[in-house]
Amino acid sequence: MPVPSPMRLAVTHEGRSIIYIPSPEYAVASGRLEPAWLEVFYNPAMEFNRDVSVVAASALRRTGLLTRSGVAFDAHAGVGVRGVRYAVEAGYVKVIMNDINPKASMLAALNARANGLEPGSYMIFNKESNSLMFHLSRERPTPVSLIDIDPYGSPAPFVDAALALSGKGTVVAMTATDLAVLEGGKARAAVRRYMLRSVSKTPVSKETGLRVLLGYVARVAAAHDKAVKPLLAYYADHYYRVYVAVERGARRSDSMLEENLGRLVYCPETGVALALSYAEDPASACGGSYVVAADPAWIGSLGDQAFLEAMLNIAVEAVWLGTRPRVEKLLNTLHGEAPLSPRSIYVSLTSVASKARVNTPKKSKVVELLRSMGYRAVATHFSGEGVRTDAPWGEVLEAVVKLGSSG
């Protein structure tokens, strides 16, 4: 491997970790850092993503969900900030950091040493991530507990290798930034990349995209005779982030597909979206015409409530997190949404009110009214004007019309 040329460095801090990064001197445009211009990729705007990751990694260890060794694998490490933080802040006994950029390998090693990691507690690779994951899946000198996929763009090209490397008790985490594709804005690309039959842009496409991603991961897992269970799945800023626990076995895989894969439909006459099994008729469910928002897609739960509660408890204690208030706010919202997320799509109040020709009511008032009617209802993290509820769409429409007409 050629020896990387020296680079000028700067220093920053995240959480409890000190991180050396390439000097941003020549990577600033219009007063903002352009991460792709750095000699080694580092995006300070993703600190929130990494803070959530550290809390999730800590919760996996604290709850016992991590049944394998305490080894974390970062497939696209960049400067090594995520892997280092897994060791320093989440207590992982070993971190494996990989990046195809040789300068990244050098910086990741520097950051590991700067944060006091012992030589045997980390490994650095300079490989194409898929080839390394397939290699480790065959060799597997050390079982991997947490596999983290955070590429530039779509995680789709890396899901197969990550699931090949996974075993019983492994958790696979991934970030997707190709939202225009996942949400149906680029339908042909979505069909190719995520193996969809159909996808369309709708007022609730933020959730559609996340469920498309989970559905793709589930189908790739099934090809390995494995099943996945979402522990945490969310939308923030310009990306999706999901964590799935892996189980082995063809029967588990079959059950997962049967119970959690279906189609998402949008009802244009009412503005409501539905998550339907393949046994359910979309026309009957919508009461008329419908648009297929995504097929196939994940229609099961978007999170594990006990795991989210454990994350919340850790976040409250983690006073060193730079984005702690935002982390707590997200986790509180996700904790409320989790039990309502199976077979449910959030309601866009703007869309429903527009179809009903009434003013858009306040979200808090809709939640209050639906609860008074005996249903569960919470705000969603996907949208500032969205509500998640177990109320039938007819009752939702009644609530929106009542409040929208009086306001």
Swiss-Prot record:
Keywords: Methyltransferase, RNA-binding, S-adenosyl-L-methionine, Transferase, tRNA processing, tRNA-binding. The keyword Mitochondrion does not apply. Its EC number is 2.1.1.216. S-adenosyl-L-methionine binds at R50, R82, D99, E128. PROSITE patterns: SAM_MT_TRM1. Gene3D superfamilies: N2,N2-dimethylguanosine tRNA methyltransferase, C-terminal domain, Vaccinia Virus protein VP39. It holds the Pfam family TRM. Coiled coil: none annotated. It catalyses: guanosine(26) in tRNA + 2 S-adenosyl-L-methionine = N(2)-dimethylguanosine(26) in tRNA + 2 S-adenosyl-L-homocysteine + 2 H(+). The keyword Cell membrane does not apply. GO terms for molecular function: tRNA (guanine(26)-N2)-dimethyltransferase activity; tRNA binding. Belongs to the class I-like SAM-binding methyltransferase superfamily. Trm1 family. Dimethylates a single guanine residue at position 26 of a number of tRNAs using S-adenosyl-L-methionine as donor of the methyl groups. HAMAP family: tRNA_dimethyltr_TRM1. This is tRNA (guanine(26)-N(2))-dimethyltransferase. It comes from Aeropyrum pernix (strain ATCC 700893 / DSM 11879 / JCM 9820 / NBRC 100138 / K1). The gene is trm1.
